Amino acid sequence: MDGHDSEDTKQSTADMTAFVQNLLQQMQTRFQTMSDSIITKIDDMGGRINELEQSINDLRAEMGVEGTPPPASKSGDEPKTPASSS
């Protein structure tokens, strides 16, 4: 009877190991798919940003203001230094 219990334990351990390996493989595949999707979306957003920047520059050139800096942000992200205000 001990030999039979030992075989059941070994089979149960093998089944659990196979289950966990399969689960980890599925998780890896899903993670890779999501990662690829995120990278693709980030690349697309980067392309759109570049297109928007080019459109803005084209519009500014048409308006004749190409040499002027863009308006300062109102959020205070760019603090003014005394040297730049004189």
Swiss-Prot record:
Swiss-Prot/TrEMBL induction comment: Reversibly induced by heat shock (HS).
Keyword Coiled coil in record: yes
Compartments, as annotated in UniProt: Nucleus; Cytoplasm, Cytosol
UniProt keyword list: Coiled coil, Cytoplasm, Nucleus, Stress response
Site residues (Required for nucleus localization after heat shock (HS)), renumbered to this chain: 35
Positions in coiled-coil regions: 34-63
Mutation effect (residue 42 to M): Expressed both in the cytoplasm and nucleus in normal conditions, but strongly reduced interaction with HSFA1A and HSFA1B
Region (Required for interactions with heat shock factors (HSFs)): 42-52
Chief subcellular location: nucleus
A GO cellular component entry from the record: cytosol
GO biological process: cellular heat acclimation; response to heat; seed development
Region of interest: Disordered: 59-86
Family matches, as Gene3D superfamilies: 1.20.5.430
Phenotype of gene-disrupted mutants: Early flowering, short siliques and seed abortion. The seed abortion occurs after fertilization and during embryogenesis. Differential HSP expression, mainly during the recovery from heat shock (HS). Increased seedling survival rates during acquired thermotolerance (AT) tests, but not in response to basal thermotolerance (BT) tests.
Tissue-specific expression: Mostly expressed in siliques and flowers, and, to a lower extent, in roots, stems and leaves.
Molecular function per GO: heat shock protein binding; transcription corepressor activity
Classification via InterPro entries: HS1-bd
Domain of life: Eukaryota
Database matches in PANTHER family: HEAT SHOCK FACTOR BINDING PROTEIN 1, HEAT SHOCK FACTOR-BINDING PROTEIN
Subunit structure: Homohexamer. Interacts with HSFA1A, HSFA1B and HSFA2.
Its job: Negative regulator of the heat shock (HS) response. Affects negatively HSFA1B DNA-binding capacity in vitro. Involved in acquired thermotolerance but not basal thermotolerance. Crucial for seed development, after fertilization and during embryogenesis.
UniProt record similarity statement: Belongs to the HSBP1 family.
Name used for this protein in its record: Heat shock factor-binding protein
Organism: Arabidopsis thaliana (Mouse-ear cress)
